[in-house]
Amino acid sequence: MSENAQLNGLCDRFRGFYPVVIDVETAGFNAKTDALLEIAAITLKMDEHGWLMPDETLHFHVEPFEGANLQPEALAFNGINPHDPQRGAVSEYDALHAIFKMVRKGMKESDCSRAIMVAHNATFDHSFTMTAAERAGLKRNPFHPFVTFDTAALSGLALGQTVLSKACIAAGMPFDGAQAHSALYDTEQTAQLFCEIVNRWKRLGGWPLPVATPE
């Protein structure tokens, strides 16, 4: 494989990390006590020229775990009725088991050693995902235990905006406020935003890194 082809590979772009975009909707801010209600995940891939793009998607409504807190303010904010049978909710175990399986498959195909979570204000999504995985007894968690790519920080650097909707608009992307706070829609927008920031850096000449030539 040529050096150029290697640099256009996903594993070499992020030092062996496999980026996966995640968004969660919850019944509060405390990952240990408040319910995880919805989660979506989108894997990413690179074409032969090194341009990053969304790949596979999974989306689940999630049943609150036994004894979970359901904060009324959080439910009013995201508009989720946890008791609605039409949600088709699944257990935390089933949702995360399916997502982790998809992620591990993508890691293997991309020759990556570890998944890294991409999320907007990533500490929140990371904490709920990792806590739910531990609570569900899932042993093969592919995500790095603390390293993330936070699109709020990246957007502040690249676009001068930190709010997801404003960052998307600044990047030239449409944003439908009526669909915001759906885990699927927010994950789709975050994935497109992350890809645009990474690809914009490439277009500006920031990647591949210049190779120092001996004098």
From Swiss-Prot:
It comes from the Bacteria. It holds the Pfam family RNase_T. Its cofactor is Mg(2+). Mg(2+) 1 binds at residue 23. Gene3D superfamilies: Ribonuclease H-like superfamily/Ribonuclease H. Keywords: Exonuclease, Hydrolase, Magnesium, Metal-binding, Nuclease, tRNA processing. InterPro entries: Exonuclease_RNaseT/DNA_pol3 (IPR013520), RNase_T (IPR005987), RNaseH-like_sf (IPR012337), RNaseH_sf (IPR036397). Residues 20-194 form the Exonuclease domain. The keyword Nuclease applies. Homodimer. This is Ribonuclease T. Trims short 3' overhangs of a variety of RNA species, leaving a one or two nucleotide 3' overhang. Responsible for the end-turnover of tRNA: specifically removes the terminal AMP residue from uncharged tRNA (tRNA-C-C-A). Also appears to be involved in tRNA biosynthesis. Mg(2+) 2 binds at residues 23, 25, 181, 186. One of its GO terms (molecular function) is magnesium ion binding. NCBIfam families: RNaseT. Belongs to the RNase T family. GO terms for biological process: DNA replication proofreading; tRNA processing.
